[in-house]
Amino acid sequence: MDILSSQANLAGYKAVIEAFAFFEKAIPMMMTAAGTVPAAKVLVVGAGVAGLQAVATAKRMGAVVFATDVRMASKEQVESLGGKFLTVEGSENLETEGGYAKEASEDFKKKQEELLSETLKKIDIVICTALIPGKKAPVIISELSLIHI
């Protein structure tokens, strides 16, 4: 495993562990005589190495996990880990020949913002791992959308 992948793997794992440490409710669903406690809902934005590790870790700990990515190949990977993949309506595959994400069009970004804004209304924890190689990490969730959490 190369250095970047190994560090991304650890970052995805640690992001979940730290997020759960700050979360003030139970993570897995619990059914007791007193009632049912619903599972925490986690959204992972970006399903590369770090994102997939975050999906796997959150799922293993009992959360309901949603994930999104601009690369269509990541849909199968997310679902194989037990996550639910969120697809932007009319989305285009934004994957380079090397398998990395590339910059999205303004129209795509608007549709993505609408999808995430609606999704955030039912999410407890958000983990952002989206990255475009050689560029600053994209701002995918606006401050206005964060109000819904």
Where are these regions (language model features)?
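Glycine/threonine-rich flexible loop motifs
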Residues: 131-140
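Glycine-rich phosphate/diphosphate-binding loop of Rossmann-like nucleotide-binding domains
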Residues: 30-119
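An anion/phosphate-binding loop that grips the pyrophosphate of nucleotide cofactors and donors
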Residues: 123
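Short acidic active-site motifs
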Residues: 115, 141-144
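Glycine/serine-rich phosphate-binding loop and adjoining beta1-alpha1 elements at the start
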Residues: 1-41
